[in-house]
Structure formats: C-alpha cells, structure tokens
C-alpha cells in the first residue's frame, strides 16, 4: 500500500468524516490540491537534512517531498489511532515532524488547542507553515463553497492566524502568495 492509500485508510478505519458526511479522503484531496497549486514555493532540489543536492530521489527527501506527504497525513496523529512513530515509519521522519507540528495540543476549546506554543512549533518546523496553510486554505475554500458557519469563524480568526504563522505584510515571506490567496478568499 502506498503512503496516500495508507493515510486514507487510517481515517476510514476510525469512521472519520469531513463535514459529518463526506469521506475524509475528500478533505485530504483538497489539501493536496492546494499543495500542488503552491508547491513551486518549496525547494525540490536539496535534501532536507543535509542540504545536499538530491542525487538519489527515492532515498533523499526534499522539503517539497516531505510537505506533499504531510498534506496527506496532516490529521493522522490528531484524528486517528496512529502515533508519531507509526507516521514516521510510513511517511518518513521529515513528514512525521511536520505532521507532529500541525497536530493540535490538548485543550478544552479551539484557543487552548491552538495556543502560542502550538504556533511556535509550527513556525520552528520546516514545512509546517506550508502544510498548515494548505489545510486552512482547503477548509476556507470548502466553507465558502458550502456557506458553512465555519467560514465566518475562519474569517474572524484570520488576522491572528496569519500573525501566529509569522506573516508580516511589510516583509518578504516565502509563503506570501499563500497568505495573499487566503486573505482574498475572505473578500466578497
């Protein structure tokens, strides 16, 4: 079984749905589509751990490779019965580190689950900001399309969300195109 099928299967095994009725695979595909749209922002030539130019692609993982895998697995630790080590075995350490970073903390509400420590972990993990943005963009696109109440919640959260991810409109940011795209989704 390839890693995409493995990620989808973990959500199936826990009867995990998106918006209460869609197979969770729908959301994973949406997040991966956003990744594909913005993958040009990611390095695809150099190995993440060493910085060496990739000469053996299946054995050397670039930031682009790790993020692609992490978009498929971004909710595994949070929503299924798999551990960090399970994810590491199936998707590799680089993707597992990203997935771990975007996994919500324990908390009684959204604010507690996604506090300062959570966002610090995302900012300090290579690729995690990209994957978190892919997830948020997919959720906002879906919320806008379905006129979901979640769309208004994401709109309200957006200024703090982008601040916590380290975006400043007055400074260059490698993911600036993604932040602009996300902001534009909230325009009427």
Predicted regions and their residues:
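Active-site helical microenvironments for divalent-metal-assisted chemistry
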Residues: 1-188
């Amino acid at each position: 079984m390839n890693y995409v099928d493995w990620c989808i299967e973990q959500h199936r095994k826990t009867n995990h749905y998106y918006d209460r009725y869609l197979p969770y695979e729908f959301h994973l595909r949406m997040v991966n589509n956003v990744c594909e749209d913005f993958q040009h922002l990611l390095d695809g030539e150099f190995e993440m751990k060493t910085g060496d130019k990739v000469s053996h692609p299946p054995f050397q993982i670039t930031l682009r490779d790790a993020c692609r895998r992490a978009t498929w697995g971004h909710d595994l630790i949070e929503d299924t019965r798999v551990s960090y080590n399970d994810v590491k075995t199936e998707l590799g350490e680089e993707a597992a580190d990203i997935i771990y970073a975007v996994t919500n903390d324990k908390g009684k509400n959204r604010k507690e689950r996604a506090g300062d420590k959570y966002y610090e972990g995302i900012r300090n993990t290579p690729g995690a900001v990209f994957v978190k943005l892919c997830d948020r963009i997919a959720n906002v696109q879906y919320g806008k399309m379905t006129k979901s109440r979640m769309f208004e919640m994401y709109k309200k959260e957006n200024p703090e969300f982008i601040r916590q991810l380290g975006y400043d409109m007055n400074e260059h940011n490698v993911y600036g195109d993604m932040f602009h795209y996300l902001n534009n989704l909230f325009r009427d």
